[in-house]
């Protein structure tokens, strides 16, 4: 019986391999302005607005995040500061992997080439990939594809 061996193994990066820390940063920036129930609602809206921003025509991820932060702040009657939106974008390259990711990825990479398909910008992703602790055959970004995942049309 033949054994199936994939040519590549593909991964998303943010949230799957890299610990996606948007909520932590939102709490850091806005937590003092609201109680916990309101914060949970803020975080839910922020996630929804980020998703909504990627479903349309492609735009740079910095715009996606700034627009999502601005929309969330407006919904919660919190003043929006552009520098806060930019802080989310600038934080992304500093995020590292989930604790169990590097060892597992290294084992797989020894046998099968790894590929990332990410909703990232070209300038951001190298820092995140470097922190994963395994070699990647290819890394493809939303910027290169001129589209975000999921693409519904």
Regions found by a protein language model. Name each.
Residues 147-153:
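Conserved Lys-Pro-Asp/Glu-containing loop-to-beta segment of HAD-superfamily phosphomonoesterases
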Residues 83-94, 101-130, 140-142:
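Substrate-recognition element of Asp-dependent hydrolases with the DxDx(T/V) motif
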Residues 28-29, 71-72, 107, 131, ...:
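Alpha-helical structural signal in soluble globular domains
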Residues 99-100, 153:
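Short, conserved clusters of charged catalytic residues that mark active-site
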Residues 4, 110, 134:
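Structured loop/turn residues at beta-strand edges in well-structured enzyme cores
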Residues 23-26, 129-133, 153:
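Short, glycine/charged-enriched secondary-structure capping and boundary segments
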Residues 2-99, 121-123:
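N-terminal helical cap/lid subdomain that shapes the substrate entry/recognition surface
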Residues 42, 135-147:
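A short, structured active-site edge motif that brings together acidic residues
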């Amino acid at each position: 019986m033949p054994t199936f061996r994939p040519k590549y193994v593909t991964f998303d990066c943010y949230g799957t391999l890299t610990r996606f820390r948007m909520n932590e940063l939102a709490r850091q920036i806005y937590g003092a302005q609201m109680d916990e129930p309101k914060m949970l609602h803020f975080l839910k809206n922020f996630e929804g607005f980020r998703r909504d921003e990627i479903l349309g025509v492609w735009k740079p991820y910095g715009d996606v995040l700034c627009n999502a932060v601005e929309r969330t702040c407006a919904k919660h009657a919190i003043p929006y500061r552009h520098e806060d939106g930019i802080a989310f974008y600038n934080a992304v390259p500093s995020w590292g992997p989930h604790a169990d990711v590097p060892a597992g990825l290294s084992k797989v990479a020894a046998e099968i080439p790894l590929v990332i398909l990410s909703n990232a910008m070209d300038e951001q992703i190298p820092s995140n990939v470097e922190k994963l602790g395994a070699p990647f055959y290819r890394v493809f970004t939303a910027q290169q594809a001129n589209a975000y995942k999921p693409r519904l049309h």
